[in-house]
């Protein structure tokens, strides 16, 4: 499943349409299953969903706090490097860059919105400046006041 996470469908134009006339591509089926699972979970209980374009999927849910935590590239690389002993800083930077590109493409393809656009969220927090613990406190405070 991780292989397909935050990917956009491959399109091969007319040739693909000949073979997929009755079938959705696997990526589209996974996107639909992900949307259904997120909506189902959010409609039955309090939960925290990280990523997955959930701010878009849950945009019509009234009691939903859409939070965007962001930080500078180098800070994120250093943080990830601390969780990946034995992996070079260059490789971690490459992985972070690749993940950013995949998230942007996924967001734009499936939601038709701009990736990292503050207008899509209720609360945006710079974890590089605030720190993780402080950001968590802000989120908890905001959630209690919904």
List where the protein language model places each region.
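RNA pseudouridine synthases
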Residues: 41-44, 53-61, 70
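ATP-dependent small-molecule kinase phosphotransfer cores
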Residues: 1-46
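Small-molecule kinase domains that catalyze NTP-dependent phosphoryl transfer to phosphate-bearing small molecules
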Residues: 1-17, 88-133
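Conserved phosphate-donor/acceptor-positioning beta-strand/loop module used by diverse small-molecule
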Residues: 60-83, 89-99
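Short, amphipathic alpha-helical "lid/cap" segments that border enzyme active or binding sites
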Residues: 35, 132-140
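Short gly/ser/thr-rich secondary-structure transition/capping motifs
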Residues: 28-32, 47-51, 105-109
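Conserved nucleotide-binding/hydrolysis micro-motifs of P-loop NTPases
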Residues: 54-56, 71-76, 130-131
């Amino acid at each position: 499943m991780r292989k397909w996470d935050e990917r956009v469908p491959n399109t091969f134009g007319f040739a693909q349409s000949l073979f997929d006339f009755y079938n959705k591509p696997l990526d589209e089926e996974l996107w639909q299953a992900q949307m259904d699972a997120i909506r189902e979970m959010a409609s039955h209980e309090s939960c925290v969903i990280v990523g997955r374009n959930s701010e878009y999927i849950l945009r019509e849910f009234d009691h939903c706090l859409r939070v965007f935590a962001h930080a500078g590239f180098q800070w994120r690389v250093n943080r990830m490097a601390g969780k990946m002993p034995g992996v070079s800083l260059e490789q971690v930077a490459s992985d972070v860059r690749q993940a950013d590109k995949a998230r942007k493409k996924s967001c734009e393809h499936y939601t038709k919105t701009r990736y990292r656009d503050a207008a899509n969220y209720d609360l945006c927090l710079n974890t590089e400046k605030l720190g993780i613990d402080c950001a968590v406190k802000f989120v908890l405070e905001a959630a209690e006041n919904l």
